[in-house]
Amino acid sequence: MFKLRIYKLSGADKGNLDHEEFFSEREEMETRYNELFVYENYSLNPTAWENVDGEWKRLEGF
């Protein structure tokens, strides 16, 4: 199981978590990540996570 954490890009809550999207396959998550990624957003881009033994671990390179 994989997830993307999507962050607010504007307003008073800028940078706070907006929502999470869940995926059963890494490839699905990567496709969605690439749709959302904007270089100029730097730290506001989504973060990618994998569920390993019941714990969410952040994936490097995303």
PLM regions: where:
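A short beta-strand micro-motif
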Residues: 2-11
